[in-house]
Amino acid sequence: MTLAAITYTRGSLSILNQLLLPHQTTYDPLHSACDAWHAIHEMRVRGAPAIAIVAALSLAVELDALAANNQLSPEPKEVEVFIREKLEYLVSSRPTAVNLAEAAGRLGGIVSAKAEVRGVDGREVAEAYIAAAQRMLEDDVKDNRAIGEFGARWVLENAVATGSESGSEKGKVAVLTHCNTGSLATAGYGTALGVIRSLHATGSLERAYCTETRPYNQGSRLTAYELVHDKIPATLITDNMAAALLARNRAGSAASVGVSAIIVGADRVAANGDTANKIGTYGLAVLAKYHGVKFLVAAPRTTIDMNTKTGADIVIEERPKQEVTRVRGPRAGEEVDGLRAMETITVAANGIDVWNPAFDVTPAALIDGIITEVGVVEKDASGAFHLARIFE
């Protein structure tokens, strides 16, 4: 059964509460843009593509309810203003993720164009919005599968396959990934994890490695959950083990499977290729460069922000200090009907200052390719990405 982070039918939206994973599977209903804002800000739903879709669909559900209760203005301009204000509010929930802002801008444009049509009423403006939001859900899964196929092909053609010394089959690859970029971060299949899924589906994956991804543990809680669910051969490591793992490539250890590529997702890609992603991504890119391992970013074109010139222009969200100083989970061994009581414990000294940026920026110079739904973008001979070409 395929994992679903988002369940939607017209007028009804629920999200898988990712704060409770992997211990509890609970779907939270969202009835309005306000509900979605809190779900996104609290990270019950996360991943740049997923939050954009949830935000868009939450407003679609709210509009449906207003129309059903005859509370929707008949005036097209009033409905347009209402929708635009709600979209602006939703964007404020996670400002670093460009997909949300891009979706809001695109949906707002659709609504404005509809409102200008002579003879339309407010309900028709709302219907135009709802139809566009629903298409986002459908398109994301299709785009993710394309990313997976393009990325898998590129890795097999350009990355060094794992060696015979490790006991692996010739032509297979091992991939390291960071954070969570799978079905739980998108409408389905995933971006970077989608590439891993595609490699596994063709029998080309030797092993996937996933980082714990402190401080929110998206790797150990979510990516590991997806890999186990899909029965993909995988190993969990802590963030500070990545260098040692890559060093085993050079050592030629008979006990190890060499890493062929590091593939990550993105929350925002600047026009020059600089990429904002989960904190720790930059460090992995530096390690990849030193160890001669290919470093790839997997993201749909909606994540590429051509209006942001470089990574220096990307606003980095800072999260609460408690995410670093506390850990939440069930007490080991205490289970009742498959559910466990969740507890929060403190793991740091009281009074210590905390710096907790949610993202870092990886310079384009450290990135070998950007995998999109229309192909893999590589740098030219001068070392520059030309991302505008994929929008032509």
From Swiss-Prot:
Gene3D superfamilies: translation initiation factor eif-2b, domain 1, Translation initiation factor eif-2b, domain 2. The active site is at residue 267. One of its GO terms (molecular function) is S-methyl-5-thioribose-1-phosphate isomerase activity. It catalyses: 5-(methylsulfanyl)-alpha-D-ribose 1-phosphate = 5-(methylsulfanyl)-D-ribulose 1-phosphate. Pathway: Amino-acid biosynthesis; L-methionine biosynthesis via salvage pathway; L-methionine from S-methyl-5-thio-alpha-D-ribose 1-phosphate: step 1/6. NCBIfam families: eIF-2B_rel, PRK05720.1, salvage_mtnA. PANTHER family: METHYLTHIORIBOSE-1-PHOSPHATE ISOMERASE. Catalyzes the interconversion of methylthioribose-1-phosphate (MTR-1-P) into methylthioribulose-1-phosphate (MTRu-1-P). HAMAP family: Salvage_MtnA. This is Methylthioribose-1-phosphate isomerase. The gene is MRI1.
